[in-house]
Every structure is written in C-alpha cells, then in structure tokens.
Amino acid sequence: MADAPRPADEVLADTLREERGRLTAALVRILGDWDLAEELVQDAAVAALEHWPSEGVPRNPGAWLMTAARRRAIDRLRRHARYRERIRLLTAEVTQMDPGVATGGPMDADDRLRLLFTCCHPALNREAQVALTLKTIGGLETAAIGRAFLVPETTIAQRLVRAKRKIRDAAIPYRVPDLAELPARLAEVLTVLYLIFNEGYLASSGETAERRDLARDAEWLASLVARLMPDEPEVLGLLALMRLHLARAEARFANGDLVLLPDQDRRRWDHAAIRDAVALLRRAERMGRVGTYQLQAAILAEHATADSWAETRWDRIVALYDLLRRVEPTPVVRLNRALAVAELDGPTAALAELEPLAERLGGWHLYHAARADLLRRVGRAEEAVAADGRALELTDNPAERRLLQQRLAAGGVSPGAAPRGRRNGPRAG
Amino acid sequence: MKYLMLIAGDEAAWEAQTDAERTASYARVVAWWRAQTDAGRIVSGHELQPSSTATTVRLDRDGRATVVDGPFVEAKEMLGGYAVLDVPDLDAAIALASSWPEPDTLEVRPIVTDG
C-alpha cells in the first residue's frame, strides 16, 4: 500500500465503503436525523474529492471525513437555536474522539450495530431492509443498488424514502435489542445478509460483468457483523458459509456455462480460503450453539474439503442434513437431503424421498431439475426429459437455461450423455 | 410516543368457545389490561361489541351518506377492541402487543400528535 501512491478517487471509494456506515451511524446517533446524516457524509465526500487530489490523501482518511462531516453538521445546526444540545455533543466529540475515530473504538462499533438492527427491523419490509442495509451500512450508492437488483434507481430511492419515513414516524428505535429479543432480531439481520448474498451469487451468470457483485458486498457486511459480535456462532457460521461459496466461485463457470458441483474442476477452488473458512466454522462450532448457518456451512465444508465428488463423505453429509432438518424443517432441506441420499444409497432411494415433496416444491425449477437427474440415473429417460422440460419452463436464469437445454438436447439417455460428462474434459476448467 | 393498538380476532372461534373458556379468557385480558394501565402504558381503550352490531356510513363527494349494515371490510378476523398506548418507541409497542394474552392479531400505528 505504501509503495505506489494510488489515485485519490480510488482511495476515496475504498475509504467511503469502509467508513460510510461508521460516519452515518455516529451522525444518526448524535443528530437523530437520518437524511441529514447521509447528506453530511455525502458533503464530506465531495470535500475530500476537492482537497485530496491537490493536498494528498490524509494519513487517516476516515478521521478526516468524520471531522469534515461534523464541522458541516455544526454549521447547519447553528442556524437553529433548538439544536444547542446537539451542537454541544458534536463539538465535544470532535475534540475528544477524532484521534481514535478510524481505528474503530467500541463506541462507534456500537453505533454501526445499532444502525444495522434498525435497518433490519422486522417492522420494515424485506426490500426496504435490503436497500437500507446496503446503503447505510454497506456504503453503496442508490444507483449501484438499483443496478445490482436490476431495478430503476428511482424505485430504490422510493423504498429508502418510505423506510426512513416509517423509522421516523413510527419511532423505530435505534439500538441493539436486549438479550431476550436478540436471537430473533439477529436472525432477521442474518436473513437479510444471506438474501443479499444469494441475490449476487445465484444471479451471477458470468456474462453480466457490469452488474455489481452483491455476494462480495454481503460477505463484507457479514465480516463486519462478525467483528462487532465475535461471540455469536451463527454470525461466524454465515460468514464461513459465504466464504466457502466464494472460494468455489471461479469454478462455477466455464466459457460462460454453469458448471455444477460434481463437474467442477477442484483445482480452481481457492483452497487457502477454504481452509480459513473451515477454521472459522470450527471456532463457531466450539461455542456450542448450533444453528442453520453453521450446519449449512458444515455441509459445504464437507464438499469443499473432499478430493472429488466420488470421495465425498456422504454419510456425514446425510447426518448433517438430519440435524439441519430439525432446525429448519423445510421441503428445500428435505430435497437437498434426498440428493445426498442418492449418493449414499442410490437414486431409487432418493426418488422415493422426492415424491412427497412434489406438492410443495412443484413450482420450483430446481426440484424438477434434481428429479430429472435422478430419473436419468435409473433409466427412466422419458420422464427425465419431461422433468427437465418443466424446469426449463420455470427459470429465467440464462446459465441455468443453457444447462437444461443441453441436457434436453442430449435426450436424457444416460448420465454420460448429460452435460456432466461433456464438461469434464481436461481444458473445460 | 402515542400509538393506537387495534385488536382483531376470529369471532366464530370466540363464539365456539364454552362459557368457562370465555370466562377464563376474559379474566386473562382484564388482568393484562389492568397491569398495562397501572404501568401507564395504556392510556385508554375499550372492547367493542361484535361486528354484527357495526354500521358503515360512506359519504360521497357531494356529502351524501349511504348507510350499510356491517363493518368496513368483511374478513375472518374482525376488530374487537382498541387501546391508546403511551410508550417510548415501536419496540416497546411491539413488546406490549406481543404480550396480549389471546391468540389474536394486533395492529400498532403511531397517532398523529401536534400539527
């Protein structure tokens, strides 16, 4: 970092990402006004763009921004006598806290955590929670959020306005929930982060490069929460889960085509990242409070540390699914368990477990795609083609559609004719 | 912060209860209501007669009134009571609503105070 000086706007972008949530949180706490806080952060960023290119990037850019924002806040508030108490707070904090600001003392850690719990308050709808979290904690611009979700910027702006209005008018508090509420409220936060992650991870098709990588944003947010709440095993579990997914991201596409787990070139996985994520997961598990994210991460860790699809410890994976099914008794978990059973006890056993799920999962393309694969393996080719056809009708994702179309073109005769065989060539990865 | 808490429930299920069950449930609600009032969290409020007693008056732009038998909307869950709350914030209002002793649905909404 010290050798080649980086352009000021690049440093600014990085710094803003790291500091925006921190600045906004501190200012919301002091001012009690969300919009004003964001405006001040924006003003401070503009001031930085004016000064830094000529005067050089300050040694502590976060502290510089915080000071600039506070000074502007004081200027603005001086016009109104009723803000005297807030001005006093601002002045006191400018002189007392500045040296430590960007190193993240416990006080401003609390600020961001409070703000995050407000963003993910259950009284806000899911879309608002997602937009608020990305904007205020993640430091994304409204336009960037719009691009990521393929939604017009004005729609995101509307959601933010409405959410902030509800926070103000319904008096949604700005605090970390107490111990009794914490499990449910933290689960809500983690749901929002995982939703952002999945939006990025599942939607990425390897060809929409201009679309922002929300999966990386979500991973950054989860790592922030893990830093702020290091004793919550589910937070660490979610972070490990995201990192295990991201460690395999490179191998998910070959020439723009989706490559499924059995066919991925495991040499392209980031094995150092996998080791770190597994270590993180083990740390979470030692805390002795199991939960859905730790279990999902444990399943993924089994896959990520196996030398090949065939050498995967399917007995352990089925056992982990049995635990997960108790924590989260959903048909999707049962479907995934059935797929592990297919490897342990064969496709016939798995098909039997799949049939009762038809009613609840019949509208989901992955149910039909999974069923098609199993049918092909037991030689029921015609039914397999029908199931793949149904899956194709139900998905818009271009990479998934291509994969299904290839399968259908192969006629569903044998596992060898499916894309799985074709993708295994030495240069495919 | 003042909120209006609307309490809605399944009237048919209420009707289907035995007298003993109804008495027990009234006792729970009365005890709860008294505790919240004593703590200053409930400012005022009332139970309402069943929705079969409701009358809806709808006014058009010219001020002409149409009077119709029944509540605003016909639904499975009908408004059965309300309370005006005085609590610090939405979390406190949600906590209060969450402690309501019957299997009902509650809506909490801030009241517009001063202009």
Model-derived regions, located:
Chain B
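Conserved, structured core segments of small domains
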Residues: 1-115
